[in-house]
Design a protein with these regions (language model features):
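Boundary/entry segment of secreted carbohydrate-active catalytic domains
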Residues: 52-95, 100
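N-terminal export and membrane-targeting signals
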Residues: 1-3
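Aromatic-rich peripheral "rim/lid" segments of glycoside hydrolase catalytic domains that contact
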Residues: 114, 133, 170, 179, ...
Length: 383
């Protein structure tokens, strides 16, 4: 599930151009069940040669929790593969995971909840002390409505709110935070043309149910993908967030979430299309709406290797991930960062979707694996 996105425009694009140009953003697939294998640990010290200077990292004023966002496929794995994935996350040093909790999967038949997949995964994360962010979304076919022209209509708010409340009550001791929908600013995930007003109405229906089921729940809104404003297809994070703040009272959420993909650029870059750079604009919108207290959670960040037109080199992937952690650490307004992803979704080097992992599909380590392990080891030593 869930969506990683690419650089929007060519280098040198102006702000005005960035807001007008069509987006070419498609989320990576998340339904592949990886095969088991044994990890290797090949890497070099050059893996992080292009990251932020070490002196900047040492001067950081706070520690940012790091997790993985592995997509829904982790729930479809064998128990052996699931355990190996979680053990490898802990070996790297991450303490958090973003898990998909799909309404369509849980309530595939109307009125009948099947929690077996999520029960199994959450039992394993709990045994390892991994803290869970659950992203809830994905409407079942039986709940999807269409207009007279056959166009999909917005999410069934009442049905989704019931599901969210049931999930929060069931997992109140196992899930620490709840993210409402995944990349609702893209038609690909919203299904109907994306619309901030419709999303805000969903948040206002769901948040009280989450808090009723789990009074200690932390609620995240946004989950925004890199995008530009393209009518009927995508809404830029800035436009989308303004629409959310105009309609959602602050009591209904605790943090904003975004997916600040920057590849092929570094997260420290100043390109106008760079979503890591655009977070500054999101922060300004939050402050303008009296919400300087809230953090921005980075619930997906990564870069694909392989041979596709959008791929980066394996050493560059390592540098981008480490630099992303350091840059998040340097800013005073970020919450946890979740890396997409632990393991490649497939084996086609030419398919961008298959190559976001720090491990290959058969569990051989890319340079990013050891680079992250070193970085997080230093982080623990500083704390």
């Amino acid at each position: 599930m869930a969506a990683m996105c690419v650089a929007l425009l060519a280098y040198g694009t102006t702000t005005a151009q960035a807001d007008a140009a069509p987006a070419t953003l498609v989320a990576p697939a998340r339904s592949t069940t990886p095969a088991a294998a044994t990890p290797t640990t090949a890497t070099t010290a050059a893996a992080v040669s292009r990251t932020a200077p070490a002196s900047r990292a040492r001067s950081a004023v706070k520690r940012v929790p790091v997790g993985f966002s592995p997509g829904f496929s982790i729930q479809e794995e064998s128990l052996e593969d699931l355990r190996r994935d979680l053990d490898q996350m802990r070996a790297i040093g991450v303490t958090r995971i973003r898990l998909d909790l799909s309404w369509a999967r849980v309530e595939g038949v109307r009125g009948r909840y099947d929690w077996s997949q999520s029960d199994r995964v959450l039992a394993e994360t709990r045994r390892r002390g991994i803290r869970v962010l659950a992203v809830i979304g994905y409407q079942p076919d039986w709940a999807q409505r269409y207009d007279s022209a056959g166009r999909p209509q917005p999410v069934d708010r009442a049905g989704f709110a019931r599901f969210a409340g049931a999930a929060a009550a069931r997992y109140r001791t196992q899930v620490g935070a709840w993210e409402i929908w995944n990349e609702p600013n893209l038609q690909r995930f919203w299904i109907a043309p994306p619309n901030a007003a419709q999303y805000a109405a969903l948040v206002n229906a769901v948040a009280p149910r989450l808090r009723a089921g789990d009074p200690g729940a932390r609620v995240l809104v946004g989950s925004m993908s890199p995008a530009n404003d393209v009518a009927g297809e995508t809404v830029s994070p800035m436009t989308f967030l303004r629409g959310v703040y105009a309609r959602v009272p602050l009591r209904n959420f605790d943090a904003v979430s975004v997916h600040p993909y920057s590849f092929p650029a570094m997260p420290t870059g100043f390109e106008e299309w760079n979503t890591f750079f655009r977070m500054r604009q999101l922060r300004q919108i939050m402050a303008a709406n009296g919400d300087a207290r809230s953090k921005i959670w980075l619930t997906e960040y990564g870069a694909p290797t392989g041979t596709s037109d959008e791929a980066v080199g394996e050493q560059d992937q390592a540098a981008m991930l480490v630099s992303g952690i350091r840059e998040a650490r340097r800013r005073g307004y970020t919450g946890p960062i979740y890396l997409y992803s632990l393991r490649d979704a497939g084996t086609d080097a030419g398919d961008r979707e298959d190559n976001f992992g720090v491990l290959t599909h058969d569990r051989h380590a890319k340079p990013a694996y050891a680079a992250l392990r070193r970085e997080l080891s230093r982080d623990r030593a500083r704390s």
